[in-house]
Every structure is written in structure tokens, then in C-alpha cells.
UniProtKB/Swiss-Prot annotation:
Keywords recorded for this protein, A-Z: Cytoplasm, DNA-binding, Transcription, Transcription regulation
Organism in which the protein naturally occurs: Enterobacter sp. (strain 638)
Cellular component, GO, one term: cytosol
Coiled coil regions, renumbered to chain: none
UniProt name for this protein: Probable transcriptional regulatory protein Ent638_2432
GO biological process, one term: regulation of DNA-templated transcription
Disulphide bridges: none
Lipid metabolism in keyword set: no
Location in the cell: Cytoplasm
Amino acid sequence: MAGHSKWANTKHRKAAQDAKRGKIFTKIIRELVTAARLGGGDAGSNPRLRAAIDKALANNMTRDTLNRAIARGVGGDDDANMETIIYEGYGPGGTAVMVECLSDNRNRTVAEVRHAFTKTGGNLGTDGSVAYLFSKKGVISFDAGDEDAIMEAALEAGAEDVVTFDDGAIDVYTAWEEMGAVRDALAAMGLKADNAEVSMIPSTKADMDAETAPKLLRLIDMLEDCDDVQEVYHNGEISDEVAATL
């Protein structure tokens, strides 16, 4: 598929901020520990751990830090009470939002998440209220490249779809459990991805205008500032014209 705006991404990421780097590392370490505790320390047989390792490396975490986190999870530690919680809700402009958390205190987490929705004109929904609009997928991203070559190699490696954006970027979609294998197969063909992650891909989009777009971005920022929030997914789409006004 072609003609998509990169603003259609399900997750908005601002330029890296040094002030948030420590918090990002803390969240990644928490996910590494939990993934290893639940599924074991072998990334080859633990897709969740493999995805966490990919994210850690993409954020320039050292192998030493990464391996220590995995060892903590395998050995058991005080993170044993952590559980994955998914909150669903509606953001500005009717945007469907899913918030993935790792928490040892549901009451604290839901209060922080609800506050973010309320402050930006949204509302926290019930389980299942928006989940049906999303599918869990692996996303392998190239900032640029030969579309035909990547598409041919990706489909041969077992990818489900390839999307080209207006700015020349290319995303390869896979079953989430197969993301690592497809990425490695592409690398073996000389096609090194710029990023690979597990994401929730929406089946429909909600167009944001000049009024709702900044509110949506504020909601995402508020949620990501919560210590317990690991990922924020949404179906908001901001056109290039609206983006230019932000």
C-alpha cells in the first residue's frame, strides 16, 4: 500500500528528550524483567522477551544492563507482583486509545490514567470498548529504501503486508510473534531495518483537526509521563496540513 502519511502511526513519538531517557530505561527494564519471569530467559522461545530486547537495543541500552534485567526476571525478584494491565478509552475527537501498563498497584495506575483522559477531554472506557479496533502486529520500519526490493524480501520472509509512506519510509507488518524472525531474515538479505517493535494497529482512523490534534498529543504525553504506562496506542490521524500548524 502507498500514499499514507507518517502521521498515521499508531504511536506518536516526539524527538528524544534527555529528561525522559531515564524513565524510558526504567520502563524497558521493567518489561524485560516481567517478560523473562513469565516466559523464561530464552528470547528464541519467548516472543515477548524478544520484543523487549529489540526495544532495549533500539534505545541504546547496553547488553550488560539488558542481561542483568533478564537475569532478575529468571531468578525472581521484587518485581514479581507486576502485572500487565490494558486500559481503553476515548480521547479528543473520538480517538480510540489503548494504554498498556505494568503495575503493582491497580488503584494508583487507573487513577493516573483516568486523570490524563479527563484533563484532555476524553474518558476512560470499559474493557473491550475499543480493543476490537486494534490488532497486535510486529512493525519493522525502514526510514527509506527500495520499495520493490523490501516488499519482495519481506513477503518471502513471511511478512503480512508492506506499507509505503509519503515521505519514502516503509513499514513491514508481521504476526507479532514472527517479527524477530522476519527482521533477521531481511537483515540476512542486506536489508537492515531502522526500527522493529510490537504495536497495536488500528483498523480505522480518526481524523484530527487543528483543535483536537494538540489535545490528543497532550493526552499521549501525559500518559507516557506516568511511570506505570509502557505504551500508548491510538487511531488518531493528523494530516500534514494540521501538523504544520502544531
